[in-house]
């Protein structure tokens, strides 16, 4: 298959070398574990964290005479993912045997798909930035294919000084290998691609995307070239298990290859590993070609065939995906593209926001969710699922501001109380006397006292009306933030003789 270069060289993404500029070319192979209660070809459980070899059937252990039976739910999940990637769904696909020896691969081969995958070409739109002007750039990244395959088991070499152990719990677990085209041109683009892909998978409910549990892993293909020249020799960095590490691995590998080429050397096509501790890649083995695996159709499995009605039935029940949701937030709620992008980045955040925004001003809800809630969660190192402030509680705080019960400053204090102690916002305001002062007489008295105590500031303010804000701040401070800010501002201007 010929590889087509669809990207125009962009100087913003060039890497300066000692002898001129270079361009990095990146392709990704993401292994995403299918969300399913049982494995691809057996009924064994896929539960994470079980005792070693607790979830192993006779099929998974490759016992003689045991035949694989396809899991229909895994097929549906692959089709859903293909639809979410705007990809071509192939109504006929074939499972092949990929032959290689690993101690944790009992069959001596992996059941995968080679020439006839279940999903063909698709695309993902990523957003890269911001640049120095605060602008984001949308970039289309092509998807080459998606195919189903089995995972291998796990070899453990640190349990005994003289022996290695094998855990087959993962053996036979269904994986979707999602292969991008070599359309990525920087580590930032690669990280944005993985983040967007994981978001889509989570929205679809086809993979949980938990890289720390191994349910999403990335193989990164990296090569460098002079801008506009043919693709160079690529190296594959295997099984990188965090988005941050992917970025670091690409940065190091690109620099490594550039240094070799500028010294007159050549790049060996090889498989490499990334060492997070050192931030370096190191050689693992020479890179295999497809013929090294001796692919051939698995004789124990018939071709996988389904009709258009099967696909349409799945398509009809797809959830709203991030790009569509972002477009709706901008169109219907008046949010900025940036705010909408933040809110749809994770399904749980989008769901939380929509619960808060229901029946309320969308922009106000977005500001509170992004600036206050997500800011507090980030500071505490908590995910949105672990927030101590429910959508109902945050919505209650917003309602109290809107009806004039509390000021914006008091609302910040109220949020802190709810975050730390919980409780109903309205009841907290009532019990702690946090209602803002709207009595004009009480506010006027405070304004008069501040003006009388600061004659020098009065003269300065008359010469420079913008200094009236100082008096507003002093009144708010004197009233413990309870005075209605609009009423204070109006009275200060009136007392100082400024026209509205």
Curated annotation (Swiss-Prot):
Q: Which SMART domains match?
A: GatB_Yqey
Q: Which SUPFAM superfamilies match?
A: GatB/YqeY motif, Glutamine synthetase/guanido kinase
EC number(s) in its UniProt entry?
A: 6.3.5.-
Q: Where is the signal peptide?
A: none
Q: Which family does it belong to?
A: Belongs to the GatB/GatE family. GatB subfamily.
The function of this protein is:
Allows the formation of correctly charged Asn-tRNA(Asn) or Gln-tRNA(Gln) through the transamidation of misacylated Asp-tRNA(Asn) or Glu-tRNA(Gln) in organisms which lack either or both of asparaginyl-tRNA or glutaminyl-tRNA synthetases. The reaction takes place in the presence of glutamine and ATP through an activated phospho-Asp-tRNA(Asn) or phospho-Glu-tRNA(Gln).
Protein name as it appears in the record: Aspartyl/glutamyl-tRNA(Asn/Gln) amidotransferase subunit B
Q: Which organism is it from?
A: Sinorhizobium medicae (strain WSM419)
The gene from which this protein is expressed is gatB
